[in-house]
Amino acid sequence: VVALTVQAPAAASSLSAIRHWVFDMDGTLTVAVHDFARIKRELAIPQEDDILTHLAGLPAAEASAKHAWLLAHERALAAASQPATGAVALVRALQGAGCRLGILTRNVRSLAQVTLQAIGLGDVFAEDDIIGRDEAEPKPSPAGLQYFQQRWQVEPAQVVMVGDYRFDLECGRAAGSRTLLVNAPDNPWPGMACWHLADCGAVLERWRH
């Protein structure tokens, strides 16, 4: 019930050897609640477009208004966040073992902090270990992950990027780090994750052994 797949790039080291962990937020540490199709309809964004990329290409006034709507929508969701299966236990176990932990989200830092507070992890991550879309170019850009590599003074392969979507995997691979996919049972992106496990609870079990 735990193992799904382990790709060849992970063979050189076990998950338990990883001491530097960067987590996506929404859908990884929390139960996914964003209705991206609805957001795109509300903001008149084509369904096939990425929201942040689309907004970045708009005239300043229009982009500002739409970012304000998006922020208000995200704020309401953040306050009501629920932890994903095993997420709190995994983060607490890694914290207890002295691992370095970071958050890399396409949301904004202040709302990531609201979310962490809502799911009971508000005391774990220092402000500088929470990187949102205003601190670094958003995923799939590797910029945010490269920030953590430099901040922690570690080689890229010593860091694992944990997420539930292809942008997390693309970010990790572009930065030269390990990649761990959770909460995506069918794995629509084969070959991109070093590890593919059911959820954070399964990650904790694998990490312990």
What are the residue ranges of the model-derived segments?
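Short, acidic loop-to-helix structural element flanking the phosphoryl-transfer center
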Residues: 76-103, 109-113, 142
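Hydrophobic residues in well-ordered beta-strands that form the structural core
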Residues: 31, 103-105, 181
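Short, basic/glycine-rich phosphate-binding loops at helix/coil junctions
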Residues: 63-74, 124-129
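Asp-based, Mg2+/Mn2+-dependent phosphohydrolase catalytic module
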Residues: 1-21, 109, 115-209
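A short acidic, glycine-rich active-site loop
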Residues: 51-53, 76-77, 133-134
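Hydrophobic alpha-helical core bundles mediating ligand binding, dimerization, or RNAP-core interactions
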Residues: 36-40, 71-74, 112-115
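Active-site neighborhood of HAD-like aspartate-dependent phosphohydrolases
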Residues: 1-62, 68
